[in-house]
Design a protein with these regions (language model features):
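General beta-strand structural signal in soluble alpha/beta enzymes
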Residues: 5-7, 61-62, 81-82, 113-116, ...
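Glycine-rich phosphate- or other oxyanion-binding loops that anchor nucleotides, phosphorylated ligands
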Residues: 53-98, 145, 153
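Long, charge-dense, solvent-exposed interaction surfaces that engage phosphate-rich ligands
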Residues: 161, 167
Length: 177
């Protein structure tokens, strides 16, 4: 069976995945001082951080649209999986679920599953690795979902921040203050 893994741009794609059509990143949009910056392969983190430091307003982010997820899901793969930034931090999960529903209205038998990573960044990448491992081992669609959901339940992600300024000014996550 063929498969595809879609991951929002908060997750990290391995170099080998960037060349593999079974993996696709969908970009979040970051806004600083009225400027929209797409978090894609052209994203310049140093420039973005300078803009954040120079801007008195809190930066904002926007998740990929349901239509963008729908386009990513619309492929020939038998099994399609999405790994999103934690639903507690972003609307990316809800957007992916809506994109799945939109595509399944047109293709009712399409097997798509959206994982709420309950994590970010490398945590999402580790989940994508687990999906790949399960698919390469020949697991059924249902067994991949069961195995990966158990993996997510046992996963713990810790973050180290240079400073807490963005956490204090950002409206999410809500319970960080």
């Amino acid at each position: 069976m063929s498969y595809k893994i879609v991951i929002d741009s908060c997750g990290e794609l391995l170099d080998e995945w960037k060349k593999d059509p079974r993996f696709e990143s969908v970009a979040l949009t970051l806004s600083v001082g009225g400027e929209n910056i797409i978090d894609d392969e052209n994203f310049d983190q140093a420039s973005f951080l300078k803009k954040v430091a120079d801007c008195p307003e809190c930066p904002k982010s926007a998740c990929p649209s349901p239509e963008r997820y729908m386009r990513a899901f619309d492929c020939d793969a038998d099994h399609v999986y999405a790994v999103t930034l934690s639903a507690e931090l972003s609307g990316s999960y809800n957007s992916a679920v809506l994109g799945k529903s939109l595509l399944q209205e047109e293709n009712p038998g399409k097997q798509i599953y959206v994982f709420n990573s309950k994590s970010a960044s490398v945590g999402q990448s580790l989940i994508a690795m687990k999906i790949q491992e399960c698919e390469e081992a020949g697991y059924s669609f249902e067994k991949v979902i069961e195995t990966v959901e158990a993996y997510i339940a046992d996963q713990h992600t810790f973050f180290v921040l240079d400073n807490l300024c963005l956490l204090y000014t950002s409206p999410s996550p809500r319970d960080t203050r």
